[in-house]
Amino acid sequence: MKLNKWVSVGVATITLSMLSVSTPALASGDGQSTQTSDSTENQTQTQTSNHTNQSHSQWQKNLTGEAHTTIAHRGASGYAPEHTFNAYDKSHKELGASYIEIDLQRTKDGHLVAMHDETVDRTTNGHGRVEDYTLAELKKLDAGSWFNKQHPDLAKSEYNNAKVPTLDEILSRYGKNANYYIETKSPDVYPGMENQLIQSLNKHGMLTDQSLKNGHVIVQSFSEPSLQKMKQLNPNIPLIRLLDKGELPFQSEADLKRIKSYAVGVGPEYTDLNEKNTKHLKDLGFLIHPFTVNEEADMQRLNDYGIDGVFTNYADKYLSLIHIS
């Protein structure tokens, strides 16, 4: 059965539906019949509301304790060059996002670095694949000037010649004062990157029972094998299965059960979510963190559906919305 065909109907809802059909006939009788109908319908509505509230209270909650978590997509990438300390500092220190989101690639000499693409062309003045650069060579590239050229209204001189950070540098800079939402990007290109990620997180004290309990680290991936490997290496790390655009509607019950066996949540492309499939995912015990949500109207609509947070380039927009709500 496909996700976009699920319908969840409670007993209380069926009762209310039946009463609403019979009410007009009752209303045409004497006042006592109308009063009885109104009383019964109000009681049924209360039962329905209580049933819904009880169901919602059992839904999976963010480990940070927040009703809605704000994931700074590649840092504050709407305001600063993505995956640079400029973007991370702004999202963490200035905007107050819940998580710094980090995409991982690996250099020729084995260093995990923060970069979305497998090539350096889009976000630096270099050319070629990350895996063909040593860390020293990668550090010579300018990872910020492109942003000033594309966004002259947001340009800052400090962005010029920004550097590509390593995972270790990021963890050293923010330590346990930040939360990290880390993606194993292109794990097929970088075999063994899961082991390296575990080693780095251990080195920086991010895999203690307390850190994991409080959601200081979440690992995400589009790759099921990569997440399953992470689960084998450390079964206590919260994992999120990312679902590309158009992928969510084709997940069967068996698919979702399999995902739930290793992941605490899913990160679907946000336009694939609707009220029904959001509720079904929540009823199955998933956290739901859709990507990449940059418009306030979409943020509000998704919150109304029942999601638990968003990936966004504009953490300030989402934070303002959830603080007002």
Give names to the regions the model predicted:
Residues 3-12, 17-325:
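Phosphate-group recognition and catalysis centered on beta-loop-alpha active-site segments
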